[in-house]
């Protein structure tokens, strides 16, 4: 069962990169270290605000969206499309401050304080939400008592909080200090624009500490408030402070699994940045790429492609004429991933090669190795296996030399090679690479994100499943599930793993157990609050098959019908996954005595398969025989007994050997 091998790679790459803000980041990026770096940068910016009157140091934090000083928690470690139960969509503030004689409007753009005119918003982009978030304070703020009202005290408190976070000694103490700093800036900053920015900065740091403690629900109202304070017409610094809050809140929603809310915040942040910096600023290009990666994680490839092309065009315009910049290389790597997911493997390969050349020219060896893995993926999709092996071995050598032989990036390449050798029938070599990868994943090096380990288990499980070693496959899926147990914002990921476990138990003939596992997975998908994806549709189809084996025919029909509706919308009526559901639904209708409906669906399936696969294809021939049998029975007025459902249902391609997992 799968949603396409290329889509699986998207999930894999997303997990490896950790945060779409850093497509070139190393594979072993850790959350804690990234958060510490962000805290230090935020504190540095606050200190600069106190010591310089010539230039607002908040600009160093908010304008620059690059690696040097971006407001980036690097906390977004998505392995799948995940969601929280019952969360409502949030609307963000992007409105002008009310004037004494009336309200401002986003459409009434004014020159910024430095004389720079605001660029017009592109009509092709979504309009920014205009409704205000209700002002919400963290419940902890009311417990803080601060007598002093000097802004210098706030800076000192933030410094102490930063030192505690950096040392990792006591995040709770750091939280107390950050809360006191916020209270100080609240008392002394009323009516002072510059001190208002101090408050915004302290709120960002407070939210980062909440995130480090896993208190995402407490971080959200803090960030909402940080967006509410700065007003766009107060100047560039304030507008970009609002931008930073949008991006950080988007990260937080991503952590909580609310992907649609996350994308909405990123889109709003991009619109603010474009207004302030103009359409062609390089930093706007970086944000376009960031938003594109978020769309990739949501499997929204067309929108991702559009945004990535915007980023590529901007970075081309800002780069040197002779050589491609590292930013352009990152854009091309992402564009290759998007094209790969869409099945455009030749185009993907072209982008990967250009990205690799640009990175090589600037001695980014490990980044080149990561791209070599993607090049190997494209070659494997094109059945150019020798070239794929060469690309993987090249990446493997670099990772071993640069990161060590027990690093998770080495294990990742082992898994790629295991998959390749399995595809070409070299089972012994495939098992050897699986075992080498498992040795690393079972004893990961310190600092390895456990999400990477879980992803590795899922990948290797799929290979064992295709070898029909189902016990080992199920064992690894259970290990992966244990890693995600009780993790916040991972409901969809857990549901995907459970769905794959349902497939394996189905293949083992444990139909009742398979049904129960699918039921749990479907429940999690329904409660996630996210839109229904192709993954959900495939899981419904599989649960329907389990119902067939348990002779729950009516329930099976309901599940197939729901799966049909979802897959028609997400994949289209000609996609193999959709056709598989049509075929299953036709068999179910026949078993229920709805012969005319069954014939109508099966005629469509046969016609489509003939058009796409050719009349000589074995799959087409089998469908034609099924249709002929139904027509013959309809001609003689079938009334007394129905053909057994299990003889009519085609072997589902989703659970055939050699398929990739759903997650």
Swiss-Prot record:
Ranges of Polar residues composition bias in the record: 102-111
Keywords noted in UniProt: Phosphoprotein, Repeat, TPR repeat
Disulphides: none
Start-end of Basic and acidic residues biased regions: 1-14, 86-100
Gene3D superfamilies per UniProt: Tetratricopeptide repeat domain
Classification via Pfam families: TPR_10, TPR_12
Chain ranges passing through the membrane: none
Matches recorded under PROSITE patterns: TPR, TPR_REGION
SUPFAM superfamilies, per the entry: TPR-like
Positions where Phosphoserine occurs in the chain: 19
Span list, region Disordered: 1-24, 86-146
Entry-linked InterPro entries: TPR-like_helical_dom_sf, TPR_rpt
TPR repeats: 147-181, 200-233, 243-276, 285-318, 329-363, 369-402, 411-444, 454-487, 495-528, 537-570, 579-612
Record-level GO BP terms: pollen tube growth; regulation of defense response
Family statement: Belongs to the kinesin light chain family.
Full protein name: Protein KINESIN LIGHT CHAIN-RELATED 2
Source organism per UniProt: Arabidopsis thaliana
Gene it is expressed from: KLCR2
């Amino acid at each position: 069962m799968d949603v396409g091998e290329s889509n699986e790679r998207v999930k894999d790459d997303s997990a490896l990169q950790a945060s779409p803000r850093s497509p070139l980041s190393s594979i072993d990026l850790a959350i804690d270290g990234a958060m510490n770096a962000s805290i230090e940068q935020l504190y540095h910016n606050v200190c600069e605000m106190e010591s310089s009157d010539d230039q607002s140091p908040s600009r160093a934090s908010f304008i620059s969206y690059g690696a040097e000083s971006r407001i980036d928690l690097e906390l977004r470690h998505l392995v799948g499309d995940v969601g929280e139960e019952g969360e409502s969509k949030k609307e963000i503030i992007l409105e002008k401050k009310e004037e004494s004689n009336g309200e401002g409007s986003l459409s009434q753009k004014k020159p910024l304080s430095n004389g720079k005119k605001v660029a017009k918003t592109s009509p092709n982009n979504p309009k920014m939400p205009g409704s205000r978030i209700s002002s919400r304070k963290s419940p902890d703020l009311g417990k803080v008592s601060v007598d002093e009202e000097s802004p210098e005290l706030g800076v000192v408190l933030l410094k102490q909080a930063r030192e505690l976070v950096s040392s990792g000694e006591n995040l709770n103490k750091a939280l107390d200090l950050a809360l006191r700093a916020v209270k100080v800036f609240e008392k002394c900053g009323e009516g002072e624009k510059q001190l208002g920015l101090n408050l915004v900065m302290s709120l960002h740091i407070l939210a980062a500490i909440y995130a480090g403690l896993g208190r995402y629900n407490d971080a959200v109202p803090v960030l909402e408030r940080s967006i509410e304070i700065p007003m766009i017409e107060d100047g560039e610094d304030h507008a970009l402070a609002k931008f930073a809050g949008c991006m950080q809140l988007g990260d937080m929603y991503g952590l909580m699994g609310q992907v649609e809310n996350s994308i909405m915040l990123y889109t709003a942040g991009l619109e603010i940045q474009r207004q302030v910096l103009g359409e062609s600023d390089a930093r706007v290009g970086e944000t376009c790429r960031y938003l594109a990666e978020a769309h990739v994680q949501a499997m929204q490839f067309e929108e991702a492609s559009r945004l990535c092309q915007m980023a590529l065009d901007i970075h081309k315009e800002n780069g040197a004429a002779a050589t491609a910049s590292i930013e352009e290389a990152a854009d091309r790597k992402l564009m290759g991933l998007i094209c790969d997911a869409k099945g455009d493997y030749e185009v993907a390969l072209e982008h990967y090669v250009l990205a690799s050349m640009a990175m090589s020219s600037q001695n980014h060896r490990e980044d080149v190795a990561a791209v070599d893995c993607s090049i190997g993926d494209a070659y494997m999709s094109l059945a150019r296996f020798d070239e794929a092996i060469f690309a993987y071995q090249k990446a493997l050598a670099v990772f071993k030399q640069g990161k060590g032989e027990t690093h998770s990036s080495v294990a990742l390449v082992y898994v790629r090679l295991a998959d390749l050798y399995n595809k070409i029938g070299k089972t012994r070599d495939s098992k050897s690479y699986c075992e080498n990868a498992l040795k690393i994943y079972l004893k990961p090096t310190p600092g390895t994100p456990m999400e990477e380990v879980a992803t590795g288990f899922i990948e290797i499980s799929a290979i064992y499943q295709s070898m029909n070693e189902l016990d080992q496959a199920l064992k690894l899926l259970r290990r992966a599930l244990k890693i995600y147990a009780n993790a916040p914002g991972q409901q969809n990921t857990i549901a995907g793993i459970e769905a794959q476990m349902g497939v394996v138990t189905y293949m083992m003939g444990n139909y009742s157990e398979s049904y129960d596992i699918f039921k749990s997975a479907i429940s999690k998908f329904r409660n996630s609050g996210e839109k229904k994806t192709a993954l959900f549709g495939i899981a419904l189809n599989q649960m329907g098959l389990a119902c067939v084996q348990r002779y729950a025919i009516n329930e099976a029909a309901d599940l197939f019908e729901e799966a049909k509706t979802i897959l028609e919308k997400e994949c289209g009526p000609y996609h193999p996954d959709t056709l598989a559901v049509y075929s299953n639904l036709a068999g179910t209708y026949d078993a229920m005595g709805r012969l005319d409906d069954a014939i109508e669906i099966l005629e469509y399936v046969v016609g489509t398969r003939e058009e796409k696969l050719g009349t000589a294809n074995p799959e087409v021939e089998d469908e034609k025989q099924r249709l002929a049998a139904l027509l013959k029975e309809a001609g003689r007025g079938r009334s007394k007994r129905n053909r057994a459902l299990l003889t009519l249902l085609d072997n589902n391609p989703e659970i055939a050997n050699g398929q990739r997992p759903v997650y």
